[in-house]
C-alpha cells in the first residue's frame, strides 16, 4: 500500500513532520555582511513554509568560517550572533513546517579564488580535467584539525537548536568533507581515518556522536549520504548500507540519499559513470573519467550546493529521468532500520508517490520548489506545476551547467524579494547576474575574514541545550 504524501511522519526523536514532502537543501548564496542570514532568507523560507512542505532544510551552513563553498555562504560558529538565525528559523516554521539546518564543511571542494583553508583527508585535488584549476590543492588534515572540526559541527548544531531550529542535517554527500573521508578514491590515509570503511566512516560517526551529546533528545539529527559516488572504485551502495547500519545506534532520525560529487555530479543528473553503483570490485580511478564539461557547473564553481535536482534540463525531464536515485534507494529501504529521504529529479506528484511506494519515507525536492514554491499545496489540490526552467541548449556543456544553477539562484533571489519566479529567464542573463553578485560577495567575504582573528584549534566544546 502506498503511503499518502500528506500523511504525517513520526521520527525517532519524537518529532512529527506534517507530511512526506521536504524542501531539500540548495545553497542560496545570499549571505549578508558577516556571512549571516538577513531578511531575504527570512522572506524566502516564509514563502516555502507557506507552500505546504512538511520539512524545510536550509542550504548548507558552514561550520568553519575559513572554509566556504562560495562567498555567499552562511556561517554559524561560536562567534556568530544568534538573532539572525532565530528570525530565519521562525520564518520557516511560521506555517507549521519543521525547519532543519544543513551543516557542512566543504573540505577540498573550495574554489581556488577563495581565502581561508582547503583541507581534505589527503592532498588529492578535485580532478575536472581542464577545469581542475578552479579548485585549490588540499592539505591533508591533522588529527588535531579533525578533532577540532568534530567540535565545530557540534557547536553549530547546538547553536542551531538555541536559535529555534528543529533539527540539523549533517552533509556527508556530494563530495564535501565528510563524504571525502568516506570515499576510498579521495581518502588514501593509512591511519585510523583511512583504509577499511569503518575507519573512513569514523569522522562522520564522531560528528554525529558529538552532536547528539550536546542537543536535546527531541532535536532531530539527520545525515545526508550518497547512495553512490558514481565513480569506479568509489563509495557505492554496499558502502551506503554499511554506513546506515553504523549510524542506526547513534540516535540518527533520518538519512537523506543523494549521489555524486563535483567530479561526478549525479545529483544534477550527470554521473561520470552511471554503472559504478554497487560493484565493490570496480577499480579504475575516477580521475579524468568525469565529463568535465558537464561537471564544472554542477560543481558549484559559483557557489552551488551541488544541485539537488536536474537543472537546466527540466523542460525535457521525463519519468525515466526523474527520481534518478530511486533504484538504489529502494534497495537500501528494504534493509534500512532508519527512515530514508530521497532527493534528485522529482518534479511530479506521480513520481513522488512512486518514491513512497518503494518504502522511502520522505520525498525531497529542490529546483522544483524554486520554480513553484507552493508545489506541495498544488499537489494537495490535485494540481501540477505549470512552469519549468527555460532549457539550455548551448554546445558548451560546462557553461550550460553553470548557467543552469544560476537560473535556480535567480528564482530564489526573486522569491526572497517577494516576487514570483521567472522560469523563462534567459540563461545568459542569469549567469551574468549571478557571477556579478558572486564577485561582490567574494570581495565582502575577503574583507570580513581579514578582520577576524585566525581560528584556533581546541575550541571549547558546547554544552547540552537545556529546555
Mark where each language-model region is.
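Flavin-dependent oxidoreductase catalytic cores
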Residues: 1-467
Amino acid at each position: 500500500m502506498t503511503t499518502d504524501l500528506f500523511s504525517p511522519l513520526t521520527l525517532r526523536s519524537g518529532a512529527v513532520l506534517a507530511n512526506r514532502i521536504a524542501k531539500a537543501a540548495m545553497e542560496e548564496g545570499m549571505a549578508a555582511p558577516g556571512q549571516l542570514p538577513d531578511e531575504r532568507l527570512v522572506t524566502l523560507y516564509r514563502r516555502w513554509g507557506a507552500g505546504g512542505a512538511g520539512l524545510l532544510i536550509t542550504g548548507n551552513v558552514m561550520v568553519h568560517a575559513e572554509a566556504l563553498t562560495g562567498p555567499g555562504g552562511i556561517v554559524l560558529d561560536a562567534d556568530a550572533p544568534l538573532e539572525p538565525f532565530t528570525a530565519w528559523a521562525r520564518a520557516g516554521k511560521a506555517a507549521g513546517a519543521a525547519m532543519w539546518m544543513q551543516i557542512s564543511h566543504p573540505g577540498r571542494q573550495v574554489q581556488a579564488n577563495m581565502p581561508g583553508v582547503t583541507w581534505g583527508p589527503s592532498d588529492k585535488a578535485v580532478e575536472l580535467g581542464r577545469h581542475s584549476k578552479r579548485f585549490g590543492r588540499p592539505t591533508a588534515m591533522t588529527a588535531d584539525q579533525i578533532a577540532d572540526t568534530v567540535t565545530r559541527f557540534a557547536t553549530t548544531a547546538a547553536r542551531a537548536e538555541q536559535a529555534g531550529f528543529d533539527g540539523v542535517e549533517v552533509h556527508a554527500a556530494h563530495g564535501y568533507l565528510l563524504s571525502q573521508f568516506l570515499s576510498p578514491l579521495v581518502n588514501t590515509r593509512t591511519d585510523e581515518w583511512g583504509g577499511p570503511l569503518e575507519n573512513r566512516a569514523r569522522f562522520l560517526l564522531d560528528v554525529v556522536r558529538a552532536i547528539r551529546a550536546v542537543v536535546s533528545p527531541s532535536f532531530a539529527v539527520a545525515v545526508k549520504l550518497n547512495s553512490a559516488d558514481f565513480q569506479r572504485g568509489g563509495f557505492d551502495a554496499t558502502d551506503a548500507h554499511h554506513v546506515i547500519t553504523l549510524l542506526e545506534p547513534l540516535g540518527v532520525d533520518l538519512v537523506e540519499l543523494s549521489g555524486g560529487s563535483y567530479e561526478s555530479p549525479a545529483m544534477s543528473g550527470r554521473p561520470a559513470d552511471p554503472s559504478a553503483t554497487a560493484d565493490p570490485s570496480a577499480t579504475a580511478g575516477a580521475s579524468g573519467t568525469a565529463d568535465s564539461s558537464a561537471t564544472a557547473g554542477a560543481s558549484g564553481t559559483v557557489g552551488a550546493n551541488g544541485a539537488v535536482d536536474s537543472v537546466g534540463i527540466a523542460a525535457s525531464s521525463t519519468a525515466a529521468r526523474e527520481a534518478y536515485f530511486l533504484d538504489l534507494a529502494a534497495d537500501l529501504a528494504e534493509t534500512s532500520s532508519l527512515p530514508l529521504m530521497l532527493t534528485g529529479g522529482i518534479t511530479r506528484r506521480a513520481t513522488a508517490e512512486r518514491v513512497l511506494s518503494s518504502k522511502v519515507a520522505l520525498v525531497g525536492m529542490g529546483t522544483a520548489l524554486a520554480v513553484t514554491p507552493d508545489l506541495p499545496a498544488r499537489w494537495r489540490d490535485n494540481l501540477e506545476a505549470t512552469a519549468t526552467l527555460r532549457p539550455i541548449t548551448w554546445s558548451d556543456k560546462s557553461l550550460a551547467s553553470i548557467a543552469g544553477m544560476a537560473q535556480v539562484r535567480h528564482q530564489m533571489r526573486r522569491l526572497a524579494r517577494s516576487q514570483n519566479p521567472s522560469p523563462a529567464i534567459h540563461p545568459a542573463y542569469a549567469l551574468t547576474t549571478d557571477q556579478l553578485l558572486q564577485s561582490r560577495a567574494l570581495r565582502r567575504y575577503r574583507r570580513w575574514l581579514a578582520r577576524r582573528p585566525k581560528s584556533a584549534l581546541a575550541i571549547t566544546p558546547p554544552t547540552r541545550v537545556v529546555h
